[in-house]
Amino acid sequence: MMFLGVINKHAPLKKKRIRNKKSPWLNAGIKRSMIERDKLKSTAIRTNFSEDWSNYKKPKNRVNNKIKETKTQYYKEHFRSNSGKPREIWKSINEVMSRNTKNDSNINSIKTNAGSTTSPEVMSETFNKYFTEIGDKLADKLPDSTKIYSDFLLPVNSTFQLRQVSLAEVLKLLKNLPTNKATGLDKIPCRLVKLSSPFIADSLCNIFNMSIISGIFPLEWKVAKVIPIHKDNEKDELNNYRPISILSAISKVMERLVYNQLYEYLSKNELLSKCQSGFRHSHSTTTSLLDATNEWYANMDQGNLNSVVFVDLSKAFDTVNHSILLKKLSHYGLHAETLKWFNSYLAERRQQSLVNGYLSSAKTIKCGVPQGSILGPLLFLIYINDLPNCLKHSNPRMFADDTNITTSSKSITKLVQFVNTDLDNLNDWLLANKLSLNVTKTEQMYIASDNSLNKISDLATIHLANKQIRRVKKSKSLGITIDERLSWTDHIDMVSKKVSSAIGGLRQVRSFINKETAITIYNSLIQPLFDYCDIVWDSLGASQAKRLQKLNNRAGRAICQLGYEVRSSLIRSQLGWSTLEDRRRKNKSITMHKILYGNSPTYLKQCFHYANSGREYNLRRSENLILPKPKTEYLRKSFTFSGVKVWNSLPVYLKNQVSLSSFKRELTSLSSYNY
């Protein structure tokens, strides 16, 4: 409060009405010229003399040219300053295209038990009650379990205790605070915390260390401001909103200090499951999907059927049981003093919901990891860390709460039996850990050859908790649409649709921006659509690859403002682009470098082996990797096969580049990689 008092004294908040300028490029000189132009137009209309019309047309053209010039300059600077910020770039594109995409955060009405209401006070209280009670209500609906959480835990022999933090650690975090984050209920902006960091770091360091020593997390830091954000469907339904929690900036600095220590301990002792790819260094959606597709292709190469269950957990982050979480933290080696701190961190958390400017009263949150926090995601990973231990016949892959479970067998009868057995085991684990499965959103898909898929009977059904899991022919996982034949047709359809829309936007704004800005838009909005997990679906068919390349050529024509009479190869040369196929090859090479030089998950490292395994590891990066021997074309489509082929084709000097940045630089300089 003392810090806030100083802020209020020297930088008091002042209310100011902000009127958005509809045309900020219209300067005073242009406005004066517009007035003169309009006067001449009025005269010409009144007299209808050809001389008056001629006198009007010349200044009209001058004004229009000047407006176009200043508008172009305005957007050029705007796009340049917002490079790497897709949201801001899209906002500007929508302005130029006159598309009404205003995201109104106001909520007109919601349905309550007493009927529909438009009162901000009632709506804020209703949302707050809904968000704080949803976890408890889901837990109350769960049936009793025959097992307990500890039945699935494996022994741990390491220990962890929070140490006191140094002034250097605190100062570093304060100086790196992002200044664009919303302000919490303590009303202390991140920007002011960052600016005053040299003067407050020592005091904050003492406060943080007092918290660690005493095992008490300050109560004032445990209250969140929650803003309901509409997701989709009806706007008056509570369950169509997600809560955005805003916490104190200073509390998040404290959390980051603790997070760094805990994450280092878990990583050093390899306590986090190898199946988990969410919120972890060197892990990503791409690595998780590569691991999955590698297994699916390998199974198909052996003549096996794959069954994949895409599990949907109901409000998983909101339903974490605090008692079980603390016991699991103890199991993973946290000392009593450290456990006391985490208990204080979780206990007595409150939140207030803000709707249309009205802030609700505070309500206590009894379960779940703190939303919007630094520690919340890591605590969730610890909570579900032992999930893989419940499965006997299947391989799970987790990205936070996004989970898929793969089972394989040559026999459909055995496969169904194995899947159903493991789903029973999964249900036991969920009940023991007081988590709920959303059966209606959980999907099951067989992935196999056409011949094998045709032999699967409709009677080969999968069940969980006596409820049938819906079988699908395609499913979206981690932003990628996966189909039962791994043809990638549906995913390419989705990418093509998004790219076409983005190119349309680029074409409409092109006349207002220069070539450099157009390239910035391409790099921010279009190229990422082609790049996202591209090495996962790189086994796409020739016609699909051609379809994507044509779209990229269209984007190049829009940037260069050239027609179809100009060859695509000339446009790519002008822009310094390679083909998308070469770009995917480049991305695959970079991923292989990360794997072989230790910057990737264990599950990918173990897929690759050097031909001469007798030499010292640090001397054989330049040697070739062992190329798997496929029985069918399926294994040839896998990353374990194509990745080896790409790496082995690289020059020795390039494979010897230890630094990833040096590797990328040298890779780009090769004639076959022009990007």
Please report, for each region that a protein language model flagged, where it lies by residue.
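Short linear motifs embedded in intrinsically disordered, charge-biased segments
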Residues: 113, 117, 543-675
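Conserved pre-catalytic core of RNA-dependent polymerases
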Residues: 131, 160-370, 407
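Catalytic palm active-site di-aspartate
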Residues: 184, 223-226, 242, 276, ...
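Basic/polar low-complexity segments
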Residues: 2-23, 46-165, 454-463, 596-629
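Short, conserved micro-motifs composed of acidic
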Residues: 160, 421, 436-474
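Conserved, non-catalytic sequence blocks in retroelement Pol enzymes and Pol-derived host proteins
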Residues: 22-29, 46-54, 81-82, 119, ...
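Basic, alpha-helical interaction scaffolds
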Residues: 1-2, 392, 467-536
